[in-house]
From Swiss-Prot:
The keyword RNA-binding applies. It holds the Pfam family Ribosomal_S11. The gene is rpsK. Part of the 30S ribosomal subunit. Interacts with proteins S7 and S18. Binds to IF-3. Belongs to the universal ribosomal protein uS11 family. GO terms for cellular component: ribonucleoprotein complex; ribosome. It comes from the Bacteria. The keyword Ribonucleoprotein applies. This is Small ribosomal subunit protein uS11. PROSITE patterns: RIBOSOMAL_S11. Located on the platform of the 30S subunit, it bridges several disparate RNA helices of the 16S rRNA. Forms part of the Shine-Dalgarno cleft in the 70S ribosome. One of its GO terms (biological process) is translation. It comes from Lactococcus lactis subsp. cremoris (strain MG1363).
């Protein structure tokens, strides 16, 4: 049977980019793009093997952020601006992990969508 050859990822020398952190109550997704919005690298707590309620922890968000940062640094990324979306628990730790991984964070902006009284919110949890 013929061996399938996969294209090697071409190393792009991109100096600056944008880190999009989507932090929900269930998971944290980190996506790194260039300034035009083309994806360079991504990672999430679920993709790293965390399952169930462990995906929503700050530690899982930290690991996802480190993995995405490492993949983006292989393509030459050095400085990033961060956009954070969502109410999850992994917001702060994901940003700290980016700085600890060696990326220079220039700005942090919160782009959480706020409804102008749109859909009815889910009922309160009684635990």
């Amino acid at each position: 049977m013929a061996k399938i050859t996969r294209k090697r990822r071409v190393k792009k020398n991109i100096e600056s980019g944008i880190v999009h952190i989507q932090s929900t109550f269930n998971n944290t997704i980190v996506m790194i793009t260039d300034v035009h919005g083309n994806a360079l690298a991504w990672s999430s707590a679920g993709a790293l093997g965390f399952k169930g309620s462990k995906k929503s922890t700050p530690f899982a968000a930290q690991m996802a952020s480190e993995a995405a940062a490492k993949a983006a640094q292989e393509q030459g990324l050095k400085t990033v601006s961060v956009t954070v979306k969502g109410p999850g628990s992994g917001r702060e730790s994901a940003i700290r992990a980016l700085a600890a991984a060696g990326l220079n964070v220039t700005s942090i902006s919160d782009v959480t969508p706020v409804p102008h009284n749109g859909a009815r919110p889910p009922k309160r949890r009684r635990v």
